[in-house]
């Protein structure tokens, strides 16, 4: 990996380039749970930078949060859970060079992939 130090703006620009067309909400979140950036689907669902991801929905929905584990270990973390359309996956992926930032998203909770295949 190259040793360039990326600015916050460059990281956010790259995030949007990579994630804006993903069919489920994706965010860059800090260890303190403040959202730094959200993709287009996240915006459609009312997410926005500056709010805490832990304030979204019901508190019990965040009991399985693994943000601290991903930040502290600097290793991606994945969990499986029962989502709106069956088995779903949650991801917390550290961003190299930004020790308190992670990319966080789920697969299978807000988008029906089985229906899309038909």
Predicted regions and their residues:
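Sensory modules in modular signal-transduction proteins
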Residues: 2-37
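Residue-level recognition of short loop/turn positions
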Residues: 32, 41, 98-99
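PAS/PAS-like sensory domain cap-loop motif
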Residues: 40-52
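Terminal output helix/cap of sensory domains in signal transduction proteins
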Residues: 56-85
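A short beta-strand signature within small-molecule sensing/ligand-binding domains used
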Residues: 85-92
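Sensory coupling linkers of modular signal transduction proteins
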Residues: 95-118
């Amino acid at each position: 990996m190259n040793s360039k130090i990326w600015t916050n703006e460059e990281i956010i620009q790259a995030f949007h380039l990579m994630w804006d067309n993903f069919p489920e909400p994706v965010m860059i979140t800090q260890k303190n749970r403040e959202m730094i950036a959200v993709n287009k689907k996240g915006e459609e669902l009312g997410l926005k930078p500056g709010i805490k991801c832990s304030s979204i929905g019901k508190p019990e929905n965040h009991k399985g949060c693994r943000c601290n584990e991903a930040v502290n270990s600097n290793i991606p973390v994945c969990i499986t859970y029962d989502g709106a359309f069956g088995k779903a996956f949650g991801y917390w992926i550290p961003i190299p060079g930004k020790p308190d930032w992670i990319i966080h998203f789920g697969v299978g909770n807000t988008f029906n992939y089985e229906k899309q295949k038909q």
